[in-house]
Amino acid sequence: MKIIVPATSANLGAGFDSIGIAVSLYLTVEVLEESSDWKIDHDLGENIPTDERNLLLTTLSAVLEDKNVALPAKYHLKMTSEVPLARGLGSSSSVIIAGIELANQLAKLNLTSDEKLKLACEIEGHPDNVAPALLGNLVIASTVAGKTSHIVADFPSCALLAFVPDYELKTVESRQVLPNELTYKEAVAASSIANVLTASLLTNNLEVAGQMMEADRFHESYRASLIPELQLLREIGHEFGAYGTYLSGAGPTVMLLVPDNKLTLLTEKIMEKNLTGHLYPLKIDNKGLQVEESVF
């Protein structure tokens, strides 16, 4: 059995902690065989546990505890990931969704998508990454009084270009630079920008969407000092035809929304700057969580 989960890119500027997209990088978890102990084969580095301390298995345990279910066996697993770690592309969220589905499959829980999303939000804290990892495409979500409401929609047609710096930026570090509160006037302005961003995405107006994502008042201006590449890439985007540029999740990945016919040009112009990192041309993943050879 294989569980496949896409990477995600959250916030899109003004959609802070609420809007996310699934993109074409993937985490794969394969169940190999029963084992005397849990064991995970991976090549993700020495800092990622290979036993029950791994986020995949702590998530599985949390789901089983929530459902008051025990597994009759432990398993040898293989985890492979194209998703860069601690770069703002939802690496932890993809593992959380995989862990929930692993519990769902092995314990035959028959969880609905809504139940999976509820569990994921309880573990992750907010829906902007876990929702598109689970559901694919563009997801706009909010959790109010413990209940997560979400809308899934087709993302406007365009290419995505992700610049992934070689340095990590932990979400907790990126959140430390945010203000504790906004004034009422600031909150109204930030909310209105987010409203227009949402409407423009849902009506396929990428020109307006790009303007609104770059006008964010919630987080990007506070985080910009942590990611020096953001402003440079935004300027390149303006000069060579990108719809918009935003900080993916908590960073440090910078994402550009690009007309398909400008992707090659923008890639070349960014590569000319010799930035330390990697460029990924990406597409929207419209499937979300996938299971091959389900145990059901």
From Swiss-Prot:
Uppermost EC category: transferase
Annotated localization: Cytoplasm
Keyword Kinase assigned: yes
Alphabetized PROSITE patterns for the sequence: GHMP_KINASES_ATP (PS00627)
GO BP annotations listed: threonine biosynthetic process
GO cellular component terms, semicolon-separated: cytoplasm
Molecular-function GO term, any one: ATP binding
Signal peptide span: none
SUPFAM superfamilies cross-referenced by the UniProt entry: GHMP Kinase, C-terminal domain, Ribosomal protein S5 domain 2-like
Biochemical pathway: Amino-acid biosynthesis; L-threonine biosynthesis; L-threonine from L-aspartate: step 4/5
Reactions performed catalytically: L-homoserine + ATP = O-phospho-L-homoserine + ADP + H(+)
HAMAP family to which the protein is assigned, alphabetical: Homoser_kinase
Family classification: Belongs to the GHMP kinase family. Homoserine kinase subfamily.
PANTHER family assigned: HOMOSERINE KINASE (PTHR20861:SF1), HOMOSERINE/4-DIPHOSPHOCYTIDYL-2-C-METHYL-D-ERYTHRITOL KINASE (PTHR20861)
NCBIfam families: thrB
Name of the molecule in the record: Homoserine kinase
Organism field: Lactococcus lactis subsp. cremoris (strain SK11)
Gene: thrB
